[in-house]
C-alpha cells in the first residue's frame, strides 16, 4: 500500500462493550473517525452534544433520534438511511430494533479515544 494508507477488516478490530446493550469498534484517522456501533433493542443513548460533525448510517435495524435542546424534532432512521448531525446539536437516540450503524465523526471523537465518554457507559 502507498505511504500512509491503512487497511482494516471490521471483524479483526476489538469490540468494546460499553454497556449490556451497547458495543462499538472504531478506526481513527487524522481528521475523521469511522465506527461500527452495535445497539440492542431498547438501548438509549442519552442526550449529548459534541464539537464533531456526525453522520449515522443505519446498516441494520432502526433508531429513533431526538434532535434539539429539548428533543423537539424526532427522526426514525431505518436500514439504508443516513442522518447528518451538525456540531453542537443536542441529540439522543433509542434503538427501536437491534441495530448496527456506521457512524462517521469529523474530527475524531477524543472522548471515545481516551475513554472519557461516560455518558455512553451508563446503562
Show where each model-derived region lies.
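Conserved metal-binding segment of the jelly-roll/cupin
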Residues: 40, 77-90, 94
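A short beta-strand-loop-beta hairpin characteristic of the jelly-roll/cupin
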Residues: 49, 55-79, 89
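Double-stranded beta-helix
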Residues: 7-14, 92-123
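A short, N-terminal "cap"/entry segment at the start of jelly-roll beta-barrel domains
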Residues: 1-31, 35, 117-123
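A beta-strand edge to alpha-helix "cap/lid" segment located at domain peripheries
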Residues: 66, 82-83, 110, 118
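ATP/adenylate-binding site constellation spanning eukaryotic-like Ser/Thr protein kinases
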Residues: 32, 52, 60, 98, ...
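Conserved hydrophobic/aromatic beta-strand scaffold that supports enzyme active sites
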Residues: 15, 26, 34-36, 55, ...
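Conserved short histidine dyad/triad with adjacent acidic residue
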Residues: 35-49
Amino acid at each position: 500500500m502507498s505511504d500512509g494508507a491503512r487497511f482494516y477488516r471490521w471483524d479483526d478490530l476489538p469490540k468494546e462493550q460499553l454497556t449490556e446493550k451497547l458495543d462499538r469498534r472504531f478506526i481513527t484517522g487524522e481528521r475523521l473517525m469511522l465506527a461500527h456501533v452495535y445497539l440492542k433493542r431498547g438501548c438509549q443513548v442519552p442526550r449529548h452534544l459534541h464539537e464533531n460533525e456526525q453522520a449515522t448510517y443505519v446498516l441494520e435495524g432502526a433508531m429513533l433520534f431526538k434532535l434539539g435542546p429539548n428533543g423537539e424534532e424526532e427522526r426514525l432512521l431505518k436500514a439504508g438511511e443516513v442522518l447528518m448531525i451538525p456540531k453542537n446539536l443536542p441529540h439522543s437516540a433509542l434503538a427501536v430494533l437491534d441495530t448496527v450503524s456506521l457512524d462517521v465523526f469529523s474530527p475524531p471523537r477524543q472522548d471515545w479515544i481516551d475513554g472519557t465518554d461516560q455518558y455512553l457507559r451508563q446503562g
